[in-house]
């Protein structure tokens, strides 16, 4: 009888252990499902912010190009030059107040995801990055859309992680999801953006990170497709290769070497100019005149070459 009671108590413990273990597994699944749902929300918000950023860049580019293509009288260039200079002074003031909004955006995002730096005021910095990027582009400076879009997405991920009180270990995944959503909003390519984020920004192939980044990218890409039904990258003609694959390999290798050398030369030249620019002993608003002047001259030369 005692043996039977011991066996019954042991069986009760086993059932309780299975129940607790099963509940623990379901709890983990619910936490993962919540993370995936929140990542989709991050993608939606990122699309609603990054897509207007892309649209305004597109609109201001054509507006500026139309102005120079119309060949206005010389006196119209004076107020535009002064306006561009004032914009650059204001943007430099913003960067002085919030240094993280300066630069391309991808190195800053990588630093935040890796825990080296933090966003203290993500909403204010996101608005400043948005406004500063639009104004700088309208002033004629050469700015890409992928880097700022990535950083804007990481700002959204940081904000949502604070609003939803997400677990500390999952904040990094929301930052990566926001970065991927920003890239997907810029190019309407969710799968490519997820791979780029995992490879060059997050650099960690956790399944959760891949899933959250892909979900956020799909939602942001859907928002971008609604605003821009015709993706300009889809208009690129694809031609069938003439040579065999093994014959093409040597050309691919040669192209890789040429692109690597040119890219390294461009990067080294940019860094050299940065050091020279930093050594100029003049106030920032005076040095900005040189930047605006160079951008203005390039715009004039480009219009004249197109007109010819």
Predicted regions: what is each one?
Residues 1-308:
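Alpha-helical transmembrane segments and immediately membrane-proximal extracytoplasmic
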């Amino acid at each position: 009888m005692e043996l039977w009671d011991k066996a019954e108590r042991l069986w009760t413990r086993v059932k309780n252990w299975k129940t607790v273990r099963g509940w623990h597994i379901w709890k983990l699944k619910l936490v993962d499902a919540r993370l995936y749902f929140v990542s989709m929300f991050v993608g939606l918000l990122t699309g609603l912010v990054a897509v207007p950023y892309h649209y305004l860049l597109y609109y201001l580019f054509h507006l500026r190009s139309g102005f120079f293509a119309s060949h206005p009288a010389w006196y119209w260039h004076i107020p535009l030059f002064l306006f561009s200079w004032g914009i650059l002074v204001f943007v430099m003031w913003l960067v002085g107040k919030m240094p993280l909004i300066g630069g391309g955006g991808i190195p800053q995002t990588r630093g935040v995801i890796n825990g080296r730096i933090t966003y203290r005021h993500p909403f204010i910095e996101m608005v400043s990055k948005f406004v500063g990027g639009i104004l700088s582009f309208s002033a004629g400076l050469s700015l890409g859309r992928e880097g700022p879009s990535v950083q804007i997405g990481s700002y959204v991920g940081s904000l949502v992680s604070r609003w939803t009180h997400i677990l500390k270990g999952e904040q990094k995944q929301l930052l990566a999801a926001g970065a991927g959503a920003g890239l997907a909003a810029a190019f309407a390519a969710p799968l490519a953006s997820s791979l780029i984020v995992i490879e060059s920004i997050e650099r960690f192939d956790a399944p959760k990170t891949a899933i959250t980044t892909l979900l956020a990218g799909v939602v942001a890409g859907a928002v971008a497709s609604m605003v821009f039904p015709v993706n300009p990258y889809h208009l690129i003609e694809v031609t069938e290769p003439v040579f065999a694959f093994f014959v093409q390999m040597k050309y691919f290798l040669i192209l890789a070497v040429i692109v690597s050398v040119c890219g390294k030369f461009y990067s080294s030249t940019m860094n050299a100019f940065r050091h020279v620019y930093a050594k100029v002993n003049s106030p920032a608003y005076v040095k900005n005149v040189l930047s605006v002047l160079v951008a203005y001259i390039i715009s004039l030369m480009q219009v004249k070459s197109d007109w010819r």
